[in-house]
A protein has these predicted regions:
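Active-site-adjacent betaalpha module
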Residues: 1-10, 37-44, 48-49, 61, ...
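N-terminal nucleotide-binding beta1-loop-alpha1 segment
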Residues: 10-16
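Generic enzyme active-site microenvironment
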Residues: 13, 55-56, 142
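Short beta-to-alpha linker loops that shape the active-site pocket of alpha/beta-hydrolase fold enzymes
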Residues: 17, 59
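Short acidic/His/Gly/Ser-rich catalytic and metal-binding motifs that mark active-site loops
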Residues: 19-22, 149-151
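Acidic/histidine-rich helix-loop elements
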Residues: 21-33, 156-158
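Charged, well-structured alpha/beta interaction segments
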Residues: 28, 36-39, 52-54
């Protein structure tokens, strides 16, 4: 992976919200248990190098959802809370770009590369990654700073979070994003 200029690369933190803790407490199994720790490391690195950080939160339009703004689950996880000056984008669909000013903000900042982390790999992270690629951004999707949950298939078969995560990364690889590890990003951010 080539170097990443801190002036042209933004970290996009997608939906790292407490609702996912509620899912785990209800017995849903996830992969990448250290993903949030990796996100915290990336946040520290981007902030230290004064590279832009943008936070995205999902606000459901369904009052019964864990992501409803008045629910506990809407809140961001404490360890990834935004710092002063870091924008927070609130979205209502899977894409961080639809119905938001994310693209405009990135273009106004002169950003041409985005590093995407968060949850879940096969929903909002995947949709945001595809759209960022389609909009012409060079996307780095951080495989160890994203996660998903087990899912039941249409015929009742179980797909593990690891299987879903791996297939999603395979689908996005090359056409929409470069799949990278957090350590790779931290090693390349700001190097010449």
């Amino acid at each position: 992976m080539a170097s990443l200029s801190p002036h042209r690369t933004a970290l996009i933190v997608v939906d790292v919200q407490k609702a996912f803790d509620e899912w785990e407490a209800a017995g849903k199994r996830r992969n990448n248990p250290d993903a949030v720790k990796r996100i915290v490391q990336l946040l520290a690195d981007f902030r230290a190098k004064r590279a832009p950080v943008i936070h995205v939160r999902h606000a459901s339009r369904d009052p019964a959802s864990h992501f409803w703004p008045d629910q506990f689950g809407f809140a961001v996880k404490d360890e990834v809370r935004e710092q002063p000056g870091e924008p927070v984008i609130v979205k209502h669909v899977n894409s961080s770009f639809i119905g938001t000013d994310l693209e405009v903000r990135l273009r106004q900042m002169g950003i041409d590369k985005v590093v995407i982390v968060g949850a879940t790999t096969n929903h909002c992270v995947e949709t945001t990654t595809r759209m960022a690629g389609n909009l012409g951004f060079k996307v780095k999707l951080v495989r160890d700073a994203t996660w998903t949950f087990d899912r039941e298939g249409v015929d009742g078969e179980l797909y593990t979070a690891d299987q879903i995560h791996a297939m999603t990364l395979a689908n996005l690889r090359e056409e929409f994003a470069e799949i990278v590890a957090a350590d790779d990003v931290m090693r390349r951010l700001g190097t010449t």
